[in-house]
Amino acid sequence: MNNKRHSTNEQLSLDEINNTIKFDHRSSNKQKFLSFLGPGLLVAVGYMDPGNWITSMQGGAQYGYTLLFVILISSLSAMLLQSMTVRLGIATGMDLAQMTRHYLSRPIAIIFWIIAELAIIATDIAEVIGSAIALNLLFNIPLIVGALITVLDVFLLLFIMKYGFRKIEAIVGTLIFTVLFIFIFEVYISSPQLNAVLNGFIPHSEIITNNGILYIALGIIGATIMPHNLYLHSSIVQSRTYSRHNNEEKSQAIKFATIDSNIQLSIAFVVNCLLLVLGASLFFNSNADDLGGFYDLYHALKTEPVLGATMGAIMSTLFAVALLASGQNSTITGTLAGQIVMEGFLRLHIPNWLRRLITRSLAVIPVIVCLSIFKGNAAKIEQLLVFSQVFLSIALPFCLIPLQLATSNKDLMGPFYNKTWVNIISWTLIIILSILNVYLIVQTFQELQG
């Protein structure tokens, strides 16, 4: 990576929200924290999107609480990587897409852009599928109609944006806590064994020695670090009004943005643990092989003998509501990430509504085509979701490596470059994640062919 300085005519990242939310570095720590509370919520959404649900609940259903340790390690890794994106955005005034385009040669940057766009589409496919299935479960709306309805989310986002970025953060936060409280309630009703849950956070050798557990563990790790989140976070932290030329204010902004990120990712960690605990407490040692998708989980909850007819109906309905909330949340953040990638790599100046409509349409089209070919077969649609998650694994190194190279560059980052211990941990994470993702991709295609 060369050391060209940031050009003065660089377009602001997400310029309609950039530098719009007040941050007073002279205020109390409480006020500073509240000023920066919000971007982490949008990032946390990617760690509990519909694409993560199946892996966590299947892991619990098939292997009990063993994989809670993997969720813990994955979440801690995510916190480190997201803190690096915070420093990149605040220290340089560029998001990850802008930085990649600006500091890499044009041919390489174009390759990275194509992969980033495909990753955004893959992310959006999971949200479209999750929302369409939730609408089908709740209101019996055909899957094709449900997928088309999700296009309207784009215009809803445009409408909300007129009232400021804080409104988006508030709506996302409300939906996140809706999902959180639903699963707290469902786990409470399912009565898990506390000692067994706590034991799950201790590493077990079976995670490595048992191929089945290892496969699910890789799925959890691969689904935890989402490429679009790295682009998103490096942009939306710039929505606050800290001085772009004062290192003291930048330092404070980095501090409170990182605290915000870690708090929200802790909530995502709890949600993923709750999903696994719910799967383990209700389905471990029974029906685990039948929990292949959202419909299987919905009907398993509805007919679970331990719950009874009334509570089973409530639990399954709440599951569908949480799925819809998660899908809508991820729709908002995925659309924003699509805008960041398109603007950052291409410097395209097109109307916001058109840019967001293009992003969503590119995700809806493959879902509609798949539904048409397979005549609404839910299993085939859920298989498309699996393919989308596999592609995210392929795309991951193409944003992690530029992030690492940029944040370890003293000329680019100034006093906010990575310390040695951060470089050691982050490079180790990148290498391990890349190896595990390659293994996961190979295993997934072998299973699909088998």
Swiss-Prot record:
Membrane topology of this protein: Multi-pass membrane protein
InterPro entries: NRAMP_fam (IPR001046)
Record's GO cellular component terms: plasma membrane
Transmembrane segments: 34-54, 61-81, 108-128, 141-161, 170-190, 212-232, 263-283, 305-325, 361-381, 383-403, 422-442
Biological process terms in GO annotation: iron ion transmembrane transport
Signal peptide segment: none
GO molecular function terms attached to this record: cadmium ion transmembrane transporter activity; manganese ion transmembrane transporter activity; metal ion binding; symporter activity
UniProt keywords, alphabetically: Cell membrane, Ion transport, Membrane, Symport, Transmembrane, Transmembrane helix, Transport
Superkingdom field: Bacteria
Purpose: H(+)-stimulated, divalent metal cation uptake system.
Family that this chain belongs to: Belongs to the NRAMP family.
NCBIfam families found in the cross-reference section: nramp, Nramp_1, PRK00701.1
Protein name: Divalent metal cation transporter MntH
Species the sequence originates in: Staphylococcus aureus (strain bovine RF122 / ET3-1)
